[in-house]
Amino acid sequence: MDLMEKNLELVEIQKLEGHTDRVWSVAWNPVSSHADGVSPILASCSGDNTVRIWEQSSLSRSWTCKTVLEETHTRTVRSCAWSPSGQLLATASFDGTTGIWKNYGSEFECISTLEGHENEVKSVSWNASGSCLATCSRDKSVWIWEVLEGNEYDCAAVLTGHTQDVKMVQWHPTMDVLFSCSYDNTIKVWWSEDDDGEYQCVQTLGESNNGHSSTVWSISFNAAGDKMVTCSDDLTLKIWGTDIAKMQSGEEYAPWIHLCTLSGYHDRTIYSAHWSRDDIIASGAGDNAIRLFVDSKHDSVDGPSYNLLLKKNKAHENDVNSVQWSPGEGNRLLASASDDGMVKIWQLATKP
């Protein structure tokens, strides 16, 4: 289906109010958003030191705040991420800790607190199997934590290499390859060649190899895992590709190569980019706007190119910090978080 030929619009479904400070990040529960008859669940985290859990009613289709996770973090909660099972929620905070919350149905309990970073924790990410998670911090380090029995978490590795604040960590969707991006303008790829847990930096994507020229804020992968989008303070989005079959065979590391750069679509820092399961890239930026892009399907001599699908100006009243597509197939729901204190739910729909 050629999305460019369809007359699409991004429709605001609901504005979720409750946070009393800027909202930094949103995360969809991976299980609830898939299952038939199960209400979608969204987590949001904020400068008000809390995480809110939102649920959509199966009857009214409206969203309500089901619970507020508070009194664990003493400073801003910068990032939140669900485990693949949807049972655990990890929360990264400026207080230097990462909280692990267990979903007991109607309530959540903080079952573990990961300590070790010297400064603010900026991001947290689970690997595809849920056997470990990664965190990163203003202390320039990336930590890998192994999930043990009895709600115990063990620091398996401390990865150093970035020269500045690390903004985000993201595991590859199908393999235990970890990606980090930083205020040092680079993306680093970490891989354990022998699967022995000894992670090494196997590639650095920087300005010298068609990378970004300023802070890299966000990383996201397409469903197949053979392409990656990154976004930056340099006002661009970049698309990268790899030989995924070679990587999955385990024979050797297949380097990521720059495929194309999308520029001129935002005029302030691009803070977030997220790739949907049906291949639509969303971006959110400091210009209060959201943009959607799709593969043009017309590969030129220079490689693939991406077209602007639509633009939503004034999506929020302030910076858009996070955009996240629902993992559910075909529903085309997008959540956004902003400095204006709001979370918004959008639907990509055909114009009437």
Swiss-Prot record:
Q: Does the keyword tRNA-binding apply?
A: no
Q: Where in the cell is it found?
A: Nucleus; Cytoplasm
Q: Which UniProt keywords apply?
A: Cytoplasm, Nucleus, Repeat, WD repeat
Single Gene Ontology BP annotation? iron-sulfur cluster assembly
Briefly explain the null phenotype. Embryonic lethality when homozygous.
Q: Which GO terms describe its cellular component?
A: cytosolic [4Fe-4S] assembly targeting complex; nucleus
Keyword check for Magnesium, yes or no: no
Q: Which PROSITE patterns match?
A: WD_REPEATS_1 (PS00678), WD_REPEATS_2 (PS50082), WD_REPEATS_REGION (PS50294)
| Sequence ranges of the WD repeats | 18-64, 72-111, 116-155, 161-200, 211-250, 265-303, 315-352
Q: Which HAMAP family match?
A: ciao1
- Functional description taken from the UniProt entry: Essential component of the cytosolic iron-sulfur (Fe-S) protein assembly (CIA) machinery. Required for the maturation of extramitochondrial Fe/S proteins.
Protein family: Belongs to the WD repeat CIA1 family.
Quaternary structure and partners: Part of a complex composed of AE7, CIA1, MMS19 and NAR1. Interacts with AE7 and NAR1.
Query: What is the name of the protein in this document?
Result: Protein CIA1
The organism's lineage is: Eukaryota, Viridiplantae, Streptophyta, Embryophyta, Tracheophyta
